[in-house]
UniProtKB/Swiss-Prot annotation:
Record text on subunit structure and interactions: Binds DNA as a homodimer. Interacts with SRO9 and YDJ1. In the absence of heme, binds to at least four cellular proteins, including YDJ1 and SRO9, forming a high-molecular-weight complex (HMC) which results in repression of its activity and dictates its DNA-binding specificity.
Parts of the chain that traverse the membrane: none
Residue ranges for the DNA-binding region feature of this UniProt entry: 64-93
Gene: HAP1
Coiled coil: 105-134
CDD domains: fungal_TF_MHR (cd12148), GAL4 (cd00067), ZIP_Hap1 (cd14655)
Organism, as annotated: Saccharomyces cerevisiae (strain Kyokai no. 7 / NBRC 101557)
Region span, Heme-responsive: 244-441
HRM repeats by residue range: 280-285, 296-301, 320-325, 344-349, 386-391, 412-417, 1189-1194
SMART domains named among the record's database cross-references: Fungal_trans (SM00906), GAL4 (SM00066)
Protein name: Heme-responsive zinc finger transcription factor HAP1
Length: 1480
């Protein structure tokens, strides 16, 4: 609607109305839009009958829709009448468009467009003047690049407009004057700064100074997950981008992965021979002694000893079954043909992973006729997922079984291959099965008779329909489910026409036999309780598209049942729950109405539609998997609707994916919401929409006017329509205004010829509703494309929308909403949500588009931040925000901004506090601040969809604020490393960090608010628990990642090692200063007391000092508690719980109380036992080839520019550099600039110095372990061979100046010796993995060979300084980690582990002059310090061993939170050992 008053056009409207009274009836047929019929004058001699017909013409009402609905007088004021303003529904005041006023409307639109273009010209001139006045010449050059040309001039039409409206001479003179004024101002500012500038002026100059800084977002935040069968790209907006791009997390991952390699190698070498010694035959000979010569043991021990227990490197050939099947006929085991149940391998393969020792109580008898194989727990050939049965021999011995395999696929092999496929998805080192999680409900335990049917064989259409009749609920329950969907869930996916859909359901299922009653909105409400249990006996599919309608119905039944508030997950966060409660909805419903609603929900809970019903429908009726291989004849509008519903269902009810589809091969039990299958499905939906022509507005096709009344929504369906003579047209009278279309569909020639005016009017309504559905589907697909791009970080499919699409918004449909107010709200939401999508598109263009992201400027990101803040805080209307984006060149008009020229300004995004507190005082969502009287409350219209619409507004706020958090984080990580080189950037980094933290905490709070209110009665989130659960939890998880980054900064200090002290809070020496420990415990106790009073609803200040880490840790613990409870219902919560538990275990501060229990040097181990490989997380348990494909692993080991030589190179200056710091490859990421984090405070330095003194005391006891041999100036633990492992601290070599190195003392680098003392303890990643699987790695060798040649002089000087530092100069400021000097003697009460030496350490010792054998305990102590962060060794072992608390989730899951591919899954054997290159 245009906001321009219509007072000036009132006379013309009246005259046009009077002149149109006596028009010919022939001119009232459907005409093309904009046709001028005023020149056609009817004859004066017309009969009275014709005049009566003329009075029944389709007249457009002049009153607004709301006043007509309320049946009150409307004053017809534009844009909003007084009645709607008084009752608080001005945002819904809607006038139907007059067809004869379209020409005048076009003139008004032209004036508005010219006005907006003039404003844009002014904005562009201001931007150009700012650019030309910039003191930096480089920035001027950058603005002349082709990528930035469209930023200022837009497209060609706007360039022409600039030339037409502004003279070139005046413009040049004006810009010249502005440029001179700007230069004078800059000179004055320089003079004032040189004299004595105050803080405000310096802050302003800093802001102006860095406005034209360029950021390259194509490197740090792009991920490429290299799988064995391909690659997956994940962009900057993906949830893993922070995991990969943050500098602290990169170093942490390097530290963790190196620890993982060491522990994995140690444990592997330790147990490889013990398994061989403890191996026993799986046959219990005590029960069946092989006494006779022919009764020998059926186990082929030669194959057993060579293939089943030996390490991987000794079994290059596929493993075969150890059972000699030729012995079955000798009497040991009865012949297979005697008993059908014996056609299985008699060996329990679960014993293979336990050292071939079967449990005594579970040892099967060889004479047993029971099948004893358990393929759910083990596969015969894990690396290749190969069946252990020799099919060649099996085919010869049992040809009959193989001959019948076509009819019964299960008879091909006695092994259940389905369970093997599930097991094959595990890592190579694990033998656990992927558990089949229980569905989101607990009622899947009940079994339909149809569910026990095997659907492997082909089923006819009649069999499928008969099975579906058994699965579907009774008729009355189906009608209740449909009403619940359209009342609560429909605004989330409004692509259906409610009236038409109910009409189809009546025809297909005969729901109209239930004598429904009609409520105020024209919706059928079943009222007969006697027919409650009337089942579905027949499903009629008269048209081909009805199969898709049936599939949509099944999805609606399933989604609505899952969304019932009683089915939502119970969340109990203890005392903190009260902080996240919001007022309940104030309801005007009576007690009887509430009781009736409760009864309806209890009835619906009893009838769950199984997910197998959808599988049958989409596989046998719709054949959805074959649509991509069939011509467009199978695609119609209903097919597109089903595909959208199917995509929506997969994302919302992800727990059903394990049952519904097996197409995902990501190696995880749950593919998650960032699965590539969703991405491919959306591309198919987009192409189907193009095939149907949805990208063109339906008004462009006049033939639709003659086609739609005959075929309704199946206009593109070329199939023949089945006859259905039993269909009664009168059954649809209560369903819709277009119900009489069914009579015209029977082939009435009179209705199609237009002789019946009633039918003509209803046909016209049907046409408009069809066009309306057309537009809704298209813009919903556009919204899906934007949301997927935001979630995955992938480019949008529908870019520059207006270049190929002219489809109008649904608000352009000429529909009378007086009988369907719900649809009016849907139309308003479509316009608003599309405008919000335009704001998101502007951000995505600058982050994901390579042409812009490679050289995006700071002031552009600042403009995006300011505009998004204005939108979410309600200080600026969404129309103004979109207009500002276009005027500033941040959003091209080709994206669709010009289509919103006639939008209603009052219908905008309400403020978030108004959304949450709406139910407290019964205030309207869009109230203008005035007090509402009781009479106004009585007059207020009871609006449907209000709570659901506000829940959607809530999700939009979360999305916008997540973008604000991401933009601030990008700018923060860009300017934080520049602090040492340019101190002016410290202020910017601090501001961006605080803003990022504020928006991260906002997302965290909103996530908690949602899950704490989903089960409340009359809550804001009624029936939205399934739809909004993942978006809310995902935003909370993203916020937690920034919390982890800040905790690392708060605890670690500067990355370069400046002013940090390598201390271990709990040492092995008795000389350790216990007062420091007591102070740490006291500080921790005080901080815990403060946390009890912590208000989770308040923002966190970065200046909180020492308590910052504790405050943020408390939020992590609460989120972990939340995900632990949600993981029982939602599979995607398991991954987030693992991620949170991982960091909680890692970052937990060690305490004296917990460490002193074990005492002595074994304090760190406690009751810890060596972690089993099967308990490791996937990204820690994988081998080298798997980890190399993980983007996080790639950047973790390549982040700090490595230097060194390969294993065959000679030592340099008496020592060799480790592999992680030995290669200076050109493809590596640039080094980190020396900087200190914004959370680093003076109090941190004070505590570090105090604990450094205590460390100096410990240092005296360990000086003797340095070998000061003149030929080998190598500290203890340094290997002459290089290693790829990262040390616990990796300071940047280039950050130290030559003056510090040549001075002989380095007082500010206390952790310098960590580089030398800890590198040797970390093993070579390549050596470890090579010893395990014997894979050559020539790429690594070449990198080693070229690394020394690329070493910089600074690196050589730095390492020379290391080798010449005498032990006497080591003091409190420059000391060795206690781990690096741990003694080799075992403690008096040490565990058995302390007597074990690392095999890698033995290898190092045999080739080292120091002859040192570090044990595992020394290694753990050595790596307990990560850049000043004191990691509890017990927590470190727990993390590296995998966060797998049996009391946490109640089961062992293979779901991981890092994308580590698995070589065991099916179809990847060809890529195994393919030496895939590592790409950036």
């Amino acid at each position: 609607m245009s906001n321009t008053p219509y007072n000036s056009s009132v006379p013309s409207i009246a005259s046009m109305t009077q002149s149109s009274v006596s028009r010919s009836p022939n001119m009232h047929t459907a005409t093309t839009p904009g046709a001028n019929t005023s020149s056609n004058s009817p004859p004066l001699h017309m009969s009275s009958d014709s005049s009566k017909i003329k009075r029944k013409r389709n007249r457009i009402p002049l009153s607004c829709t709301i006043c007509r609905k309320r049946k009150v007088k409307c004053d017809k004021l534009r844009p909003h009448c007084q009645q709607c303003t008084k009752t608080g529904v001005a945002h819904l005041c809607h006038y139907m468009e007059q067809t004869w006023a379209e020409e005048a409307e076009k003139e008004l639109l032209k004036d508005n467009e010219l006005k907006k273009l003039r404003e844009r010209v002014k904005s562009l001139e201001k931007t150009l003047s700012k650019v030309h006045s910039s003191p930096s010449s480089n920035s001027l050059k950058s603005y002349n690049t082709p990528e930035s040309s469209n930023l200022f001039m837009g497209n060609d039409e706007h360039t022409t407009l600039v030339n037409a409206n502004t003279g070139s001479a005046s413009s040049a003179s004006h810009m010249h004057q502005q440029q001179q004024q700007q230069q004078q101002q800059e000179q004055q500012q320089d003079f004032s700064r040189s004299a004595n500038a105050n803080a405000n002026s310096s802050s302003l100059s800093i802001s102006n100074k860095y406005d034209n800084d360029e950021l390259d977002l194509t490197k740090d935040f792009d991920l490429l997950h290299i799988k064995s069968n391909g690659t997956i790209h994940l962009g900057a907006t993906h949830w893993l981008s922070i995991m990969k791009g943050d500098p602290y997390l990169k170093l942490l991952w390097g530290h963790i992965f190196a620890m993982r390699e060491k522990l994995n190698e140690w444990y592997y070498q330790k147990n490889s021979y013990s398994k061989l010694k403890s191996s026993k035959c799986p046959i219990n000979h005590a029960q069946a002694p092989p006494s006779a010569a022919t009764r020998k043991c059926p186990v082929d021990h030669s194959a057993f000893s060579s293939g089943m227990v030996a390490p991987k490197e000794e079994t290059p050939l596929p493993r075969k079954c150890p059972v000699d099947h030729t012995m079955f006929s000798s009497g040991m085991i009865p012949p297979r043909e005697d008993t059908s149940s014996q056609k299985r391998c008699p060996v329990d393969h679960t014993m293979y992973s336990a050292g071939m020792m079967p449990p005594k109580d579970e040892t099967p008898s060889p004479f047993s006729t029971k099948a004893m194989i358990d393929h759910n727990k083990h596969t015969m050939n894990p690396p290749q997922s190969k069946c252990p049965v020799d099919h060649r021999n099996y085919m010869k011995e049992y040809p009959s079984d193989m001959a019948n395999s076509s009819s019964n696929p299960a008879s091909r092999c006695p092994i259940d291959h389905s369970s093997m496929k599930n097991t094959a998805a595990l890592p190579a080192s694990t033998h656990n099965t992927i558990p089949h999680h229980q569905p989101q409900s607990g009622s899947h335990a009940r079994s339909h008779p149809a569910q026990s049917r095997k659907h492997d064989s082909y089923m006819t259409e009649s069999e499928v329909l008969a099975t579906l009749c058994e699965m579907l609920p009774p008729k009355r329950v189906i009608a209740l489910f449909i009403e619940k969907f359209f009342k609560h869930l429909y605004p989330a996916i409004p692509i259906l026409d409610e009236q038409n859909f109910k009409n189809h359901m009546n025809q297909m299922l005969s729901l109209s036999s239930m004598n429904p009653t009609v409520n105020n909105f024209g919706m059928s409400m079943p009222s007969s309780s006697t027919l409650e249990n009337q089942p579905i006996t027949q499903i009629n599919l008269p048209k081909l598209s009805d199969s898709c309608n049936l599939g949509i119905l099944i999805i609606i039944l399933r989604l609505t049942w899952l969304s019932i508030p009683s089915n939502s997950c119970e969340v109990d966060l203890g005392e903190e729950s009260g902080s996240f409660l919001v007022p309940n909805e104030s309801s005007n419903m009576s007690a009887s109405a509430l009781t009736s609603m409760a009864k309806e929900e209890s009835l619906l809970l009893k009838h769950e539609t199984p997910v197998e019903a959808l599988e049958l429908c989409q596989k046998y009726l719709i054949k959805f998997d074959e649509l991509s291989n069939i011509s467009n004849n199978n695609v119609n509008l209903t097919t597109v609707q089903f595909a959208i519903f199917y995509n929506f269902y997969m994302k919302s009810a992800s727990n059903d994916l394990t049952t519904l589809t097996n197409t995902n091969n990501t190696g995880m039990a749950n593919p998650g919401h960032d699965s590539e299958s969703h991405q491919i499905l959306l591309s198919n939906i987009t192409q189907m929409a193009f095939s149907c022509g949805l990208h063109r507005d339906p008004d462009n096709f006049p033939q639709l006017n003659a086609t739609i009344p005959a075929t309704s929504q199946d206009v593109s369906n070329n199939g023949s329509k089945k006859a259905n003579p039993s269909t009664n047209p009168t059954l649809n009278n209560n369903m819709s205004a277009a119900t009489t279309n069914s009579s015209s569909r029977s082939g009435s020639a009179d209705s199609r010829s237009g002789s019946n005016p009633v039918n003509k009017k209803e046909n016209q309504v049907s046409i408009e509703r069809f066009k309306h559905t057309w537009r809704k589907i298209w813009y919903y697909i556009v919204s899906m494309d934007v949301n997927q791009s935001l979630s995955l970080g992938s480019p949008r499919l529908l870019r520059n929308l207006r270049d190929f699409s002219d489809t109008k918004l649904p608000s352009a449909s000429r529909i009378d909403y007086v009988r369907d107010i719900k649809e009016l709200i849907i139309v308003k939401n479509f316009t608003l949500f599309f405008q919000i999508d335009l704001c998101i598109i502007a951000v995505l263009n600058h982050i994901l588009n390579v042409s812009l992201a490679r050289s995006v400027r700071k002031f552009e990101l600042d403009s995006l931040i300011n505009l998004l803040k204005n939108l979410t805080y309600g200080t600026e209307n969404v129309n103004d925000v979109v207009g500002s984006l276009i005027n500033k060149g941040l959003l091209p008009t080709s994206e669709g901004g010009s289509v919103d020229s006639n939008n209603d300004e009052i219908y905008g995004l309400p403020k978030l506090p108004d959304i949450l507190n709406h139910g407290q005082h019964n205030q309207n969502l869009y109230a203008d601040g005035r007090n509402t009287s009781s009479s106004d409350i009585d007059k207020k219209l009871d609006l449907p969809h209000e709570s659901t619409t506000r829940a959607l507004f809530f999700s939009k706020h979360m999305t916008i604020r997540m973008l604000l958090y991401l933009l601030n984080y990008i700018l923060f990580t860009h300017y934080e490393p520049m602090g040492s080189e340019d101190p002016g950037t410290n202020i910017l980094a601090k501001e961006y960090a605080q803003e990022a933290l504020n928006f991260a905490m906002d997302g965290y709070r909103n996530c908690m608010i949602f899950f704490n209110n989903i089960r409340n009665t009359n809550s804001l989130f009624d029936y939205m628990n399934v739809i909004l659960s993942y978006p809310c939890l995902d935003i909370g998880h993203r916020s937690l990642q920034f919390i982890v980054c800040l905790i690392l900064r708060a605890k670690c200090g500067p990355l370069t090692g400046m002013r940090e002290s390598s201390i271990i809070t709990n040492g092995t020496s008795s000389g350790f200063n216990s007062s420091v420990e007591d102070e740490d415990v006291k500080v921790k106790q005080e901080s815990s007391d403060e946390l009890k009073k912590d208000d989770f609803m308040k923002d966190v200040n970065l200046d909180s000092g020492d308590s910052l880490a504790e405050i943020l840790m408390s939020r992590m613990l609460l989120f972990q508690k939340l995900t632990k409870q949600l993981s029982k219902k939602y599979n995607y919560a398991i991954r987030m719980n693992k991620s949170t538990g991982f960091f909680v275990s890692l970052l937990d501060t060690p305490s004296k109380k917990s460490d002193s229990k074990s005492g002595g040097s074994s304090f760190m181990l406690g009751n810890w036992k060596h972690p089993k490989v099967s308990n490791m997380s996937g990204f820690l348990a994988g081998d080298k080839d798997q980890l190399q494909k993980c983007p996080v692993y790639q950047d973790a080991l390549g982040f700090v520019s490595p230097t060194g030589a390969n294993e065959g190179s000679a030592p340099m200056q008496g020592m060799s550099l480790q592999g992680s710091t030995a290669r200076m490859g050109g493809t590596q990421l640039p080094p980190i600039r020396s900087y200190k984090p914004i959370t680093y405070t003076s109090s941190n330095l004070r505590r570090m110095n105090e604990t450094g003194e205590a460390e100096a005391k410990r240092r005296r006891f360990n000086d003797g372990y340095i070998d000061n041999n003149s030929n080998n100036d190598i500290p203890r633990g340094i290997s002459p061979k290089p290693s790829n492992g990262l040390s616990s601290v990796q300071p940047l070599l280039s950050s130290f100046s030559m003056n510090q190195l040549n001075g002989g003392t380095i007082p500010t680098v206390p952790s310098l010796t960590n580089i030398t003392s800890q590198m040797g303890a970390l093993p070579s990643l390549d050596r470890i993995t090579t010893n395990q699987i014997n894979l050559p790695d020539p790429s690594r060798d070449e990198a080693f060979d070229n690394s020394i040649k690329q070493m910089t002089p600074m690196t050589s000087a730095f390492m020379n300084a290391n080798t010449t530092i005498p032990s006497s100069t080591l003091n409190g400021n420059m000391n060795m980690n206690g781990a690096g000097t741990a003694n080799t003697d075992t403690s008096a009460n040490g565990s058995a582990l302390s007597t074990l030496t690392s095999p890698q350490g033995s290898d190092l010792a045999s080739n080292s002059a120091t002859q040192y054998k570090p044990d595992l305990e020394d290694f753990l102590m050595q790596n307990s310090n990560f850049n000043g962060l004191m990691i509890n060794p017990s927590s470190l072992v727990e993390v590296v061993g995998g966060y797998n608390d049996p009391n946490n989730l109640g089961r062992n899951d293979a779901v991981d939170f890092l994308p580590v591919d698995n070589v065991e899954i099916d179809g990847l054997v060809d890529f195994y050992r393919a030496d895939f290159p590592i790409w950036e």
